[in-house]
Amino acid sequence: MKNKEIQEQRIKGYFLQATKDLLKSEGLQSVNVRNIADRAGYSYATLYNYFKDINDLVFLCVYDFYGECEQHVREHTKRQERGIKRLRASIRAYVDFFVQYPGIFSLFFMENLGSFKDKGRATEIISFSLDKVCEEEWNYCVSKGILQVEQVELIKSQIRHATLGLLMLYINQRVSFPYTELINRLYLQTNAILESCSPGGGRDGGGVSVHNSLISIKVK
């Protein structure tokens, strides 16, 4: 790689990191050309030498943030037993990532993406991010007969909507319960969905599960 190309990539990286830092700390409302340029240490005119507009930068941030979320989930679940246990752990790690970075959650799920040049691609990355970070375990559970292949898409959809709903309420402070209660409710919801759809109740052993949105009781 030539020196000019190396310098170009480095300057692009400064602008990208500056945008990511603003999104994480202050949200999309803080992202404008001058703020990005100030944080990157360059003039705002320089930004347009490397990017068409701010939307280009924000889309790259979406892609990078998804990669960070995926890495976070992988790092926090690699020691878990494969199957349902790692699937549950992956869902929790996904939630923990957004609790740690509420600005990213706001960008992903609360901002209008209508002006994005690559709106369709960005929407797909965002909307199915939970499914994707758990994809290996979904496939593993199907391959081992833990979950039935014809039900997996329904289970994914139910868990995705329940998880994002909880996060939306928690991050927007529409509920008063603490983080520990968030995780407790996450487990209850996840268990209820898995137990209602999987041949073995999503657990080892037999028995019949009785559950609703607040309780999950296994009757031997």
Identify the role of each PLM range:
Residues 40-51:
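Short hydrophobic/aromatic patch on the recognition helix
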Residues 1-10, 74, 201-220:
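N-terminal intrinsically disordered/low-complexity leader segments
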Residues 96-100, 136, 140, 159-178, ...:
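Amphipathic C-terminal alpha-helical segment
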Residues 74, 118-144, 153-157, 164, ...:
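Amphipathic alpha-helical packing segments from all-alpha helical-bundle domains
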Residues 74-103, 155-159, 203, 220:
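Hydrophobic alpha-helical connector segments
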Residues 15, 30, 53-58, 69:
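Short amphipathic alpha-helical segment with a characteristic S/N-K-E followed by hydrophobic residues
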Residues 61-87, 106-109, 119, 130-143:
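Amphipathic alpha-helical linker/stalk segments
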